[in-house]
Amino acid sequence: MNLFHYYTYFKSFRVIDREELSLTCVLLAYKIRHGFIKLEDTNVLYNHLKSINKGKSSGNSGSNAKSANKTSPNLVNVEMELLNFLGYDLEIELPFVYLSSLRRKFNFSNKTENLIINMINDSYRRPLCVFFHPRTIALAITFVAMNALSEDNFLMNIYAFIKNDMEYIKDEFLPCVEILLNLLESKMNKD
């Protein structure tokens, strides 16, 4: 609600309708609190908001299968405008930038690199870039991937690397690893 009121107080609605703005605020609040949510999962809420605005009964909003599949095509643009308005830095550095230097440093296998790339892609489902530096994310993912594939001979190198070369990420390394392990565990449970 704070996002919605803050935005509507300082901005006009120009091309954004209230349903899209409301849903975007709900999505952002959910992402901040819990992590990634698929846009398809918002269809029912979007149609419910549309039906309330048109004066329809809220009980019929989920009954029509055709309308339940309709979502706002503009939702991502509204989210970007809202984040931009709030001053959020939309130029986010990606963990991929550090992958080649980690590959040179630890000389891990192609299998490990593929797992690392998949885990970096999956990490976008959690707001890791908001909480951790991309270098920390890349290093934590490398650690988890090497641990998952039992490349024990390299694990001590990572600890030494953190201790000697990257002292400044030491405090955020273990919390990032914990989140990634939970992500990997939940993904393995789904498969």
Predicted regions span which residues?
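Structured all-alpha helical bundle cores of eukaryotic regulatory proteins
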Residues: 1-177
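C-terminal regulatory segments
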Residues: 176-191
